[in-house]
Structures are given as structure tokens and as C-alpha cells.
Amino acid sequence: MRFVLDASVSLCWCFSDEQSAIADHAFALLQKDEEAIVPALWWFEIRNGVTLGVRRKRISEDEMTVFFARLSEMLIYIAPLPQTSAVFALAQRHRLSFYDAAYLELAQRENIALATLDQALARAAVAEDVPLIGA
């Protein structure tokens, strides 16, 4: 089963004070060698979130290194860039950020489920008939 993985789910795996059944489900899928696909911005969002976590002392630099090593072992692929108009239309229709709409557009384009902890993005996915992981 291939699915779109968003940054909110991925970052949940990094911080011990964040727990989510959806994140656990997505992690379990990846542990079974299932594949996730992400928009290019995911790479930056993850690294920014972890950098802030280190700065705020939520994790150490050593824990950061371990987290990135674990991520690199998972079958997570970066998708080709989308058509701007498709992402913009979703952002406008559902009042999402362009970033969040990129995850939704990718799930639509690939015709696969989306793993997200973002409530607005999840509502938009439901409205667009995009299945959600763990829902």
C-alpha cells in the first residue's frame, strides 16, 4: 500500500511527547516495507521541525541524528513537482496553505491515501474523497 505522508505525522515519530494512532499506523506500514510518497517540501518541513526541536531542547542532536538515520531507511520517495494550478485550486477551495494543498494534490494525483494529523487537511481530503490513513 502506497500512501502520502505529511510532515505532521513524520515529526510525531521524532518527539516522545507526541503520540498519535495515525502516526503509529503510518509507521507500522513503513516498517512492513510499504512505500510513502511526499512532496519535495516535506524534506524541508521535517528538517525545520527537528531543528526547532533541538533548539527548544525537545530532543538532542544525537537523537536528531538517529531520527534522520531511521527516516533514510524507510521507503519514502519524493514526488515530481505538481502543476501549480492544481495545488492552488485545492488551497483556494479548502482554505489551505499552499503547502498543505500540495499533500492533498499528491494524494489525488497518485490516487492513494493520505496520512496527516492536520485537521483542516484531513477535512479537505474527506471533501475530495481522498482516503485517510488510520481513519
Regions found by a protein language model. Name each.
Residues 9, 42, 103, 120-121:
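Alpha-helix capping/helix-boundary segments
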Residues 2, 96, 104-135:
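Acidic, PIN/NYN-like endoribonuclease modules and their adjacent C-terminal/linker elements
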Residues 1, 33-36, 76, 109-113:
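Short active-site oxyanion
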Residues 40-43, 63-94:
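Acidic catalytic patch
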Residues 1-41, 53-65, 128:
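Short, well-structured N-terminal submotif of metal-dependent ribonuclease cores
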